[in-house]
Curated annotation (Swiss-Prot):
The keyword Nucleus applies. This is Rhox homeobox family member 2B. InterPro entries: HD, Homeobox_CS, Homeodomain-like_sf. Residues 16-136 are annotated as: Disordered. GO terms for molecular function: DNA-binding transcription factor activity, RNA polymerase II-specific; RNA polymerase II transcription regulatory region sequence-specific DNA binding. Transcription factor maybe involved in reproductive processes. Modulates expression of target genes encoding proteins involved in processes relevant to spermatogenesis. SMART domains: HOX. Belongs to the paired-like homeobox family. PEPP subfamily. It comes from Homo sapiens. A motif (Nuclear localization signal) lies at residues 186-195. GO terms for cellular component: chromatin; nucleus.
Length: 288
């Protein structure tokens, strides 16, 4: 048999690899813990408010660290447990980042929604037809205010800015309303004046038509004028209105008798030329 010293040395040589493996695993666990702490500090610096994903990752890291510290399994099992901690860590980080990305997308959608809400009214306003556009409101004056404005218009059709402002202040209306009323009143007055001028021009246009007058009517017209009574002119001048002129004289009803000339004598018997007699017109004057 071998001596006891050799047996003890052999046993220590057999057990030394296991002890070395345990030390290596402890060192590896310590390194993993230090790495997890550094990653945790970086995440806290990058995200001051930890989210649910990071909290779940921390729980998984602590559970993996506790499982690595236990010495129930062999070296390979411990290696697998130690290597699983970073895997859970990255899964937790991915979940946290996905959650944060989801929150960012939600915030972007919430930011876009007001823009869409504002853009819809703009489109609705742009789609309005010209016929549906609201007309500007016109102020309705009271009868007393209209009477006052009419009196001012009779005195001055173009009021100054100071007068318009004073009227607006006294009537408790805007200056624009007063200005619009005066513009409309001037337009109405111009239309009335044009209508009066057109009505007065109609008789002149009727009298101005050309009339054919014969020589007999031209000769007899002064006789009819002298034979008319003064009552005719008086009645017609007063019966007609001031806007219309005096009507024209009526044409003669019956023509005067033509002058009867005797037959011409022969040329040899004429003593005083071709007309040896005196022509005396015979006119009958009407009884006055």
């Amino acid at each position: 048999m071998e001596p006891p010293d050799q047996c003890s040395q052999y046993m220590t040589s057999l057990l030394s690899p296991a002890v070395d493996d345990e030390k290596e695993l402890q060192d590896m666990n310590a390194m993993v813990l230090s790495l997890t702490e550094e990653v945790k500090e970086e995440e806290e610096d990058a995200q001051p408010e930890p989210e649910q994903g990071t909290a779940a990752g921390e729980k998984l890291k602590s559970a993996g660290a506790q499982g690595g510290e236990e010495k129930d399994g062999g070296g390979e099992e411990k290696d697998g447990g130690g290597a699983g901690v970073p895997g859970h860590l990255w899964e937790g980080n991915l979940e946290g980042t996905s959650g944060s990305d989801g929150n960012v997308e939600d915030s972007d959608q919430s930011e876009k929604e007001p823009g869409q809400q504002y853009s819809r009214p703009q489109g609705a306003v742009g789609g309005l037809e010209p016929g549906n556009a609201q007309q500007p409101n016109v102020h309705a004056f009271t009868p007393l205010q209209l009477q006052e404005l009419e009196c001012i218009f009779q005195r001055e059709q173009f009021p100054s800015e100071f007068l318009r402002r004073r009227l607006a202040r006294s009537m408790n209306v805007t200056e624009l309303a007063v200005q619009i009323w005066f513009e409309n009143r001037r337009a109405k007055w111009r239309r009335h004046q044009r209508a009066l001028m057109a009505r007065n021009m109609l008789p002149f246009m009727a009298v101005g038509q050309p009339v054919m007058v014969t020589a007999a009517e031209a000769i007899t017209a002064p006789l009819f004028i002298s034979g008319m009574r003064d009552d005719y002119f008086w009645d017609h001048s007063h019966s007609s209105s001031l806007c219309f002129p005096m009507p024209p004289f009526p044409p003669p009803s019956l023509p005067l008798p033509l002058m009867l000339l005797p037959p011409m004598p022969p040329a040899g018997q004429a003593e005083f030329g071709p007309f040896p007699f005196v022509i005396v017109p015979s006119f009958t004057f009407p009884n006055v």
